[in-house]
């Protein structure tokens, strides 16, 4: 959602507090499930709105023509407002990075997309710092796929495999690049880059070093054990925090 108040209004105006009993049929069981989702949405929307109401304004100005920045603007308020959600997912809408055509050079479409990403992340980090939440916030980027090395016939690049990602925040081990420069000559049979690290090594680092889980939990979550890249300082936020206790008591 783009606005906590709008989300609350949407749920609040389209719910019913009383229902007739669902029939004792397969369809009735499905109806009960839908109703349970509705009730959970009511509780969730009130919790989200309460967190947003505690912090009415951000400490930095986010450009409204940058969709990612607008999303991170909301996330920053909700974190500062005490919402105990551990993972926030924001995305760049549409197929912006799916640059099959007219990808451009240093001033082209892809360069502008990276500039928007840089601007949004920079403002978010500054905002968290000024709101006093930076010690508890880290972020990472990911994508469904990378891009092929060779240019296609439309001045773009097609779907590929390996791709870089960024990790950011106050308590990461920053200023480092993991891996070597991509080998643009020795490719796989389809012309794709050969990966150096499995992306799940980044998720393993997030679980072990940031959330403070153990190896068993990491293995269950990722369906096998992975060696974690050294990405986060030894200041894990853990699954339970003082903020959780504070939020639950409000």
Q: Residues of each region from the PLM?
A:
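RTX-like calcium-binding, glycine/aspartate-rich low-complexity repeat tracts
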Residues: 236-250
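Acidic/histidine-rich, metal-coordinating catalytic segments
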Residues: 137-146
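Glycine-rich, charge-dense phosphate/pyrophosphate-binding loop(s)
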Residues: 133-135
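Feature for exported/extracytoplasmic and membrane-associated proteins, marking the mature portion
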Residues: 1-131, 150, 164-170, 176-236
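Phosphate-handling catalytic cores of nucleic-acid transaction enzymes
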Residues: 159-160
């Amino acid at each position: 959602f783009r606005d906590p108040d709008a989300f609350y209004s949407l749920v609040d105006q389209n719910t019913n507090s009383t229902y007739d009993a669902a029939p004792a049929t397969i369809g009735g069981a499905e109806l009960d499930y839908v109703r349970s989702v509705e009730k959970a949405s009511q509780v969730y929307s009130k919790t989200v709105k309460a967190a947003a109401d505690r912090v009415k304004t951000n400490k930095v100005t986010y450009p409204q023509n940058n969709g990612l920045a607008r999303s991170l603007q909301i996330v920053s308020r909700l974190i500062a407002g005490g919402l105990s959600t551990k993972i926030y997912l924001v995305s760049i809408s549409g197929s912006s990075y799916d640059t099959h055509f007219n990808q451009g050079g240093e001033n082209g479409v892809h360069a502008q997309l990276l500039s928007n990403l840089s601007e949004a992340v920079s403002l978010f980090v500054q905002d968290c710092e000024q709101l006093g939440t930076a010690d508890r916030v880290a972020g990472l980027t990911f994508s469904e796929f990378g891009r092929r090395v060779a240019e296609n016939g439309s001045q773009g690049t097609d779907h590929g495999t390996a791709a870089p990602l960024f990790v950011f925040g106050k308590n990461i081990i920053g200023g480092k690049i993991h891996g070597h420069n991509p080998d643009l000559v020795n490719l796989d049979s389809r012309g794709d880059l050969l990966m150096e690290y499995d992306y799940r090594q980044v998720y393993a680092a997030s679980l072990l070093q940031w959330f403070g889980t153990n190896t068993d939990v990491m293995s269950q979550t990722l369906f096998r054990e992975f060696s974690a890249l050294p990405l986060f300082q030894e200041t894990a936020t853990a699954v339970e925090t003082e903020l959780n206790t504070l939020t639950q008591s409000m």
